[in-house]
Structure formats: structure tokens, C-alpha cells
């Protein structure tokens, strides 16, 4: 039933604009001048990775990246639709380009990503300065869409694919520190959490060929990168087989199937100096096999982002999270038993979901007290049009109550983060040096295996090297220390 709902609700027809104004092939593939492209990314890490794919697709067509929008011939905003606030941020940003567009009518402004996919044609109607709209699976079509705009027409493609993974595209790294990079391993989500718009903006789950992933990670290591983060809306459900790209899927077990635990091991074996992270995990899919793989390889970071969303079993059922409070707590115990007590665990939490009571809220606070996350991403509920929650449940928790509950969650998380950091004082951690700290060039920073930021004096440090740091102090969000030798 869940598959049918997702199939019914995801629109896959190509928009009329693409067929009405198809430019000639030579207009697309034979650039005569160089154009400056400016890309701004909002939302999750996946959007950052997607923006790097976009730049790679457009470079052969005469586009060069610029880091200032004032110099741009084309501005792309890669958007998020997970909350209303994210979309309002994009609309506000677009309004700031009005004067720029008036001064330069030839400036092309495009909206990419999840907001583009959700609003489709409506976005062109509501935001008059927008020339181009492209969903997450339409980036290969950007040269054609831009040629359509150049011919004097608006352009839109929000086609959702069942196959697209951009596996053959080598991303051009944007704003890179030269140490850490993202690798997209799968796209889409089949989970259908009742509050979430992602299945409708990114489509069905598709796993990328593992050998292309290993190739990309190997090339990054050879270029000097020392950390890769494997990305997906739900990385633990990664599953690839030789039949993945075929329309007819096998009904019996196949040889050559690669699951997420096996992929982790494949990437970890590239080189012991290449750190591996991954995000994001759904609790139902993080198996013991994954946990034992993390334990087996020193270069797979001992850190798991495991969103709980609520500590109330009743609310979790309404959210369609497929687990309850007791099951989630058992999964946390499994992580600490198998990977180790030092494994960093973070979470996502939503305050004020539909019908949430004070008792439900207290269940969330008590779960936090029991687990004591290293850190969390915390928000109050924002109803998203088209989701199951929007269609089935009343958004009946007053905004003031949502904000108060959220603040209580934030306060508790700050307390726990500080307590956990205090316990690290006196310990020595291996830290991957990322470069100068945000506050001072005298101090440098990096992260330990548990994903904690560590700041230390720069004593002839080099980016991309590992140093041992003795933790001497801390703040709520940062460990402070001195470089030492063991």
C-alpha cells in the first residue's frame, strides 16, 4: 500500500514547456562565450552535493563558477522544502535579486531542488523574476533549459526519475576545504513519514553503482581529501544489484547484491587514512551488520546520526516512523554495545506535532535524558502541503506552545552537550585537521571520530593531517585542547 501511495502521488510527466521550446542541439553543445554561474545552496548536505553535480554538468557548456552573485550571468538557488521557514528564506533571498535583475534584464535566475519540485509551475507564476525551475532529477537537462531561457521563454522540468543517480558525473567541489567531501550514494526516500515532503520532492529510492562510489572516493583520496561522507535521504536502505538499472526487477535473491554494510567496508578498504562518515540513517534500517562493520574499521567514524523525531510512541505511530519508543531505545543500546560507549549519537526532534500533548512532550524530554545525545537538530512542526499529516491530521498545537516546547528541548540538549563535553576533558583524541578555526587563524580546528569540533593552537599543522589532541577545556559545542604525542 505504501508503494502505491508513493507511486500515485509522485508526478512524473514532463512539463509542456520542455516540449514546446526545444532548442537546436548545436545551441546546447557548442558554447561560444564563457558565462559566470553563481550557485547558492540551502538545506541538507544532499543539496550541497547536488550543486556540485550541477556545476559539473554545466562546465562543458561554457559556464565557470563565480563566488559573487554580482558577477554572475546565471544565478541558481538550490532549495529546501522540508519546512515553511526554509521556503520563506528562499523567497526573501529571491526578492533581494530584484534590483539586480532590473539593472541586468539578461540575468538568468533559476530555482533548483526540492522547493522547485514541490511548487513546479506555481513558482514561475508567484516569483516573476524566476526564469527557470528544475527539480532534483532534472539537472542533466539544465543546458537545454538554459537555452530555452536564452530563446526568450520560461523553462521548467520537474520530471522525477526512477533511475537517475548521476553516478557518471564527477562533481566539481564547491567551497571545499580540500579535506572533506560529500559523495551521494543514493537518491529518494520510500519511508513516507507522515510529516515529510521528501518522498514527493526527491522520488523513489535509487541506489548508485558501488563501484562508481569507490572510484569517486579513491579519486578524492588521491587528490588529498582525507574524509568522505556518504550521503542519502536514508543511507542504510542502500541496496544495489546488477539488475538495479533494469526495468524488470528480479523476484529471487541475486548474486552481486551490495548492501550498505558491504558498501561501507568497500570504501573503508580504499586506504586506512581515509575517514568515512555517513548520513542520514533511519532507525529501522541500521542493522547489526552495519554496526559491526563500523566497529571493524578504525577509519569508519564512530558517529551515527539517528533521528528519533519524538519520544512518544503514540506520536511516532502518527508520524509513521515504524518503530516505538522501546524499540528505538533498544537500538541505542545495540549501538553502544556493538560500536562502543564512545560512539557519538545525534538526533532530529520535532516539537508540537499534530495532537501532541504535554505528556507526549515529556516523553521526548525523558528519552533525551535517558540517551543524552551529543547534539541534535531541533525544530517545531511545520505542516507541509501534500503530506499524509497535512491531509489526515489537524495542525492543532498552538504556535506559542510549539515554541515553548522546542525551547525546552533545546535547553535540555544544550545541557547534555555540555555535560558530554566535560567528560572528554583529560582524554586524547585523534583529530583530522581541517584548517583555521572560525574565530582565529592562530587556532586551528578539526573533528574527532565522534564528530565533535576540536580547537587547538596551530603548531606547524597541515590541513589533511591527523594530530593527537589532549582535551583541556570545552564549551557547549566545542572541545578545546593542546596537540600532544602519545
UniProtKB/Swiss-Prot annotation:
Its main location: cytoplasm. [4Fe-4S] cluster 1 binds at residues 44, 80, 114. GO terms for cellular component: cytosol. Its EC number is 2.8.4.3. Residues 422-485 form the TRAM domain. Keywords: 4Fe-4S, Cytoplasm, Iron, Iron-sulfur, Metal-binding, S-adenosyl-L-methionine, Transferase, tRNA processing. [4Fe-4S] cluster 2 binds at residues 189, 193, 196. Binds 2 [4Fe-4S] clusters. One cluster is coordinated with 3 cysteines and an exchangeable S-adenosyl-L-methionine. SUPFAM superfamilies: Radical SAM enzymes (SSF102114). Residues 175-419 form the Radical SAM core domain. It comes from the Bacteria. Monomer. HAMAP family: tRNA_metthiotr_MiaB (MF_01864). Belongs to the methylthiotransferase family. MiaB subfamily. This is tRNA-2-methylthio-N(6)-dimethylallyladenosine synthase. It comes from Amoebophilus asiaticus (strain 5a2).
